[in-house]
Amino acid sequence: MAEEKRSDQKKTGELTRSLPRNYRQIGEPGAKKIYIEDYAFTYINSVAYQTPEDEQAGVLLGEVQKSDEEKCLFIKGVIRAKTPENETKQGIIFNEKIWEKIYAEIEKFFPDLEVVGWFAAMPGITQERFLYLKKLHMDNFSGGMKTMYLVNTCDKEENFYL
């Protein structure tokens, strides 16, 4: 499938690249930028709002590009974290079994991409729940450019955290 490129190029320090039309920039311009492919954004929202009463999660796949002046995170793919039936009452978790399945799917469907963060979708995010998600992020996705994308299906709010 041919990928249509924008005619305008973004120049960042010494990093010059053409952005495909199917990417959208998230957040305010600054030294760190997040770009997400429309496919990935649409897939996350379809998962989140298909059963908005359920807690769901997955990993974000892509790449990080750096220059002297800025860092850009490109999200190109998503893999859902499928929690086994007997563990669904625990809510969102990332244990060894779940990671094994995620890495098997990455190898099969996205072998050229790396884990660049994760998403969580749930109805309502209390302060206590947010602290749990933040700890989950630090335990499983620590690193300079790893992002957390939270979808509050009750309030229909979506936020990226770097």
Predicted features along the sequence, with ranges:
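N-terminal beta-strand/alpha-helix entry module and adjacent surface
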Residues: M1-G117, P123-L162
